[in-house]
């Protein structure tokens, strides 16, 4: 009886502590996302602290009424990817492997996604409601800060593709686009949600993408912008029409300003495709197409099997020995196959493909159930990039993905009470 009374009297304090830790979790998610943009090593440390704070918050909170299957689907899909990556790593990693980098990247993804499943679950079951718009304006400023930083880097290395701190220009482009989506969507949740402010943000993002010269994002991001405008302004034809006209003007301006590098990248793409049709895949696009063909071939031969990075590389070499036109793919045998589905299938078989599709489905499902249009836009970005590259891999971009999901769910909770 006395014990029951003590527990009851302590409950308000534990709940308050849980709420404080939850707020700290979201703040750390914000910093994890930003730091991942420039420093892989430090970002994983901040992310690990975020996960610990999240777990403490969940423990102190106790069971909630909204702990249901609806709110478990997305965390489960994230956890499944992390678990499969961990199983794959444990089954095949050996000392002194020539594919150490590949194994290490999957181990990092496993940790990030397993921890991330708990952070996303905390967010989906959150009872916190805040009407402060200062947070939204802080998020909105991110794209402009990135654009300013990119301008500074470009002034020093004028003719180079900028890469920030994530290793490659392509990685910088993906990171910029994902953070840019969070930044742009944030302004749409404010009272001053005029499409001009969203498009101003889009202009900053497109400027950075043009500096990275990454074709996939330069094609994908305008489509995502149109999808966002349709989702948010479909009931206001005047705003929608004016915003589309302004978006076209922005795109035209970007093309004019960056005409030379864009034209060069376009010509390179045409040359790559021409080379591929002439049995030469040792080009950027040609290597991708060769990887897709090889990856599908490896999967079809053994669709139910997990296979090591060494085994996949051996299969790639055998296929290239038979079909020399696919030799461009060999350069990436110690990286990945530049498509989420094909990469997952080539190493983890049907289970790998299922886990990736389950994640995509879960993101769309939660976006629909929570009426989270921001999450829908982010999901389109994740799926779109996954068609031509692998981003559920390594450290920086997985951290940005999890953090972006969390932050978009947090700001969506301002307007929705659906659980």
Swiss-Prot record:
What induces it, per record?
Expressed in both exponential and stationary phase in rich medium (at protein level).
Q: Where in the cell is it found?
A: Cell inner membrane
What GO MF terms are annotated? Answer: glycosyltransferase activity
State what inhibits or activates this protein. Activity does not require ATP and magnesium ions.
**What is the enzyme's class at the highest EC level?**
transferase
The reported result of mutating residue 303 to A is: No change in activity
Pathway, according to UniProt?
A: Bacterial outer membrane biogenesis; lipopolysaccharide biosynthesis
Q: What does this protein do?
A: Transferase involved in the biosynthesis of the lipopolysaccharide (LPS). In vitro, catalyzes the transfer of a polymerized O-antigen molecule from its polyprenyl diphosphate membrane anchor to a terminal sugar of the lipid A-core oligosaccharide, finalizing the biosynthesis of the lipopolysaccharide. The enzyme is functional and can be used to give diverse hybrid O-antigens in vitro, but K12 strains do not produce the O-antigen in vivo due to mutations in the rfb gene cluster. K12 strains are phenotypically rough, their lipopolysaccharide having a complete core structure, but no O-antigen.
The protein in question is named O-antigen ligase
Q: Which organism is it from?
A: Escherichia coli (strain K12)
Gene symbol of the encoding locus: waaL
């Amino acid at each position: 009886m006395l014990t029951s009374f003590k527990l009851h009297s302590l409950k308000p304090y534990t709940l308050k502590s849980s709420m404080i830790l939850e707020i700290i979790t979201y703040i750390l998610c914000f910093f994890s996302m930003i730091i991942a943009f420039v420093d892989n090593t430090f970002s994983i440390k901040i992310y690990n602290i975020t996960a610990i704070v999240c777990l403490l918050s969940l423990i102190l909170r106790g069971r909630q009424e909204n702990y249901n299957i609806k709110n478990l689907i997305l965390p489960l899909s994230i956890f499944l990817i992390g678990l499969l990556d961990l199983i794959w790593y444990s089954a095949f990693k050996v000392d002194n492997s020539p594919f150490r980098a590949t194994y290490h990247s999957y181990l990092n993804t496993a940790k990030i996604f397993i921890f991330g499943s708990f952070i996303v679950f905390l967010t989906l079951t959150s009872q916190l409601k805040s009407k402060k718009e200062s947070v939204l304006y802080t998020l909105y400023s991110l794209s402009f800060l990135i654009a300013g930083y990119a301008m500074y880097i470009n002034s020093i290395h004028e003719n180079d593709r900028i890469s920030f701190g994530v290793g490659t220009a392509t990685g910088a482009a993906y990171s910029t686009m994902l953070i840019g989506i969070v930044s742009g969507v944030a302004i749409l949740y404010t009272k001053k949600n005029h499409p001009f402010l969203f498009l101003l943000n889009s202009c900053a993002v497109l400027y950075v993408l043009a500096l990275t010269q990454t074709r996939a994002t330069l094609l994908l991001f305008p489509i995502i912008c149109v999808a966002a405008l349709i989702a948010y302004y479909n009931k206001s034809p005047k705003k929608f029409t004016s915003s589309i006209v302004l978006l076209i003007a922005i795109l035209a301006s970007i093309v004019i300003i960056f005409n030379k590098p864009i034209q060069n990248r376009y010509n390179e793409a045409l040359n790559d495709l021409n080379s591929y049709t002439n049995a030469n895949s040792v080009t950027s696009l040609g290597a991708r197409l060769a990887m897709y063909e090889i990856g599908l071939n490896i999967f079809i031969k053994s669709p139910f099997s997990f296979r090591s990075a060494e085994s996949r590389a051996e299969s790639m070499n055998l296929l290239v020995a038979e079909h020399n036109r696919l030799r461009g793919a060999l350069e990436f045998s110690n990286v990945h196959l530049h498509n989420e589905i094909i990469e997952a299938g080539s190493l983890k078989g049907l289970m790998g493909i299922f886990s990736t599709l389950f994640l995509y489905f879960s993101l769309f499902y939660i976006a629909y159930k929570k009426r989270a249009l921001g999450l829908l836009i982010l999901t389109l970005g994740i799926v779109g990039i996954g068609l031509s590259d692998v981003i559920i891999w390594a450290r920086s971009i997985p951290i940005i993905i999890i953090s972006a999901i969390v932050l978009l769910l947090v700001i969506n909770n301002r307007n929705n009470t659906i659980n």
